[in-house]
Structure formats: structure tokens, C-alpha cells
Amino acid sequence: MVLKLLGAAVCLLVLAAYIGGRKSSVGTSASEPLPASASSTGAAVPSGPVILKPQGADGSASVRVGDAKFSVSPDGRTLFVEGGIGRRFSADLEQALAANAFLQRIVITSGGGYAGSGLDAAGSIRRRNLTVRVRSHCASMCVGLWASAAAREMEPDAVIGLHQWRVACDVLADAEQRRECEYSAQFWTAHEKSYEGWLRSAGFNDRLLQLQKQTPADQVALLNVPALRENGVDFRVVDPDGHYLNREQTRRFLLNKYGRRGAD
């Protein structure tokens, strides 16, 4: 949920995969060990997913999740969501859907949040047959929203982040946060199969599901467009205006955006 380093990681991933010409795959077999964690400064670019551990993270849900900002495009067809999946997220989404009957797409930037609100929102997205596009990053519970969509899109420089859901609630000093953490853990245990089912329906293979289960809750495994493609995830790459980009167009988009930084 706490992804302060996402911006730098996004840049590293896309430069390594497209401009530097390096592959960004996740091993060759489900039993292959995961890559070593990258440093928190993002100084190295591994050939697999980038594993980040925000400084001060302790494996607990100790940081309170804020509520995302919602806005609707002038034509009423696109809902823009930016921020955490907080307590009000599902209710805010339902309100936006009810007020905008012609919504077709959600464009989201989120580091994740609470399982209960997120899973409820994923169900709403599924029922409305919405398309979900990732802008910049979508991690933790946000990936469930993306996977549950009728169609998935990613902007070329976007990443998704996976990690497990087991958290150390007992280390929290604040009683309210501890109760909230324990409730989320119980809720997640009861609904884990739904989350995994959505990921599988989106094309996540056993290798990626293993990555999600093996990455500790206080870390995040970031995957870019090439890594997701190579592992069979079903999505389209589009530019910020929604135009489809093939592999060569994606490469050119990133060259134009980032120049030659990191190419050598």
C-alpha cells in the first residue's frame, strides 16, 4: 500500500525494457527463485520484477489509507481515480456509477488499500462490464480492480505491483489500527479465492500468482508492460488519449517521453 518509490521505479522499468533493450521477464519456470530485492534507491535494474521495500515498512498495515479523488470526463464516459482505496472507495465508486449512466472506462492510479472496500468495488466493476486503464501505477488491491474489468488497458510507462496479504497486525501500537488490520486480514482470508480468480481470468499465470504470494506484505513486486505480456496477461497498451500502441509504437512513445536516459 505504501509505494513512495513508484515514480522512480516506473522510469527504471520502462527504460530498461524498451530503451535499453533489456528483457523484463519473470523467470522461466514457476519453481525458479525470485530475483533479489532491488535497493530502495533504485540504483540497479534487475532482469525480472523490481522488488521494493519502502523505508520504514514493517509488514504491518500501519499507514492509514486516504480516500481517492474521483473525477469524470466532460463527455461522462471516463472516470478518473487517483489515490488510495480507502474506507469510502466502494461507496464513492457506486455513487459515481449511479450519477453517470454512460461511464465506460476507469483510468486509475493507486497504490492499493483496504481489501473489503476494494473487493466490493471490483464486484461493481465486473457487473458494469467496465474497462480499467492503469496510468502510472496500480498496486496491491488496485490490481484486483484492474483484473476484474471486462477489458484491461495500460499506458506504456505504467506498472502494476503485487504482494501477499499476510500482515503483522500484532505489532501495531494503536488499538484502532490493530482492530482495522485484523478485520482486513479476516476479510481477505475469506475472499482470497475471489481475488485469485480475477487474476487468473485476466491471464495471470502460475508464475505471477506465485510472485504475488511470495512477495512479503511490506514489499512490492513491480511489473511493467513487457513482463506482463511475456506472462500471458490479457490487456491492451494505449497512449494517454486511448489510442492503441503496438510494440514499436510503445518503444517510440517512451523514447519521446524519456529521451535516451539509461539507454547505454
Residue ranges with predicted function:
Residues 2-21:
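Hydrophobic membrane-insertion alpha-helices, especially the h-region
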Residues 78-85, 107-113, 129-135, 178-186, ...:
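Second-shell loop/turn segments in exported
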Residues 169-261:
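Charged, glycine-interspersed solvent-exposed loop segments at helix/strand-loop junctions
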Residues 34, 58-92:
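STAS-typified acidic loop motif
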Residues 90-97, 118-122, 126, 143, ...:
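Extracytoplasmic/secreted envelope proteins and their assembly/folding machinery
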Residues 117, 126-167:
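Glycine-rich beta-to-alpha active-site loop
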Residues 25-56:
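Juxtamembrane proline-rich low-complexity "stalk" or linker regions positioned immediately after a signal peptide
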Residues 104-110, 133-137, 155-158, 205-215, ...:
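Surface-exposed patches in mature extracellular/periplasmic domains of secreted proteins
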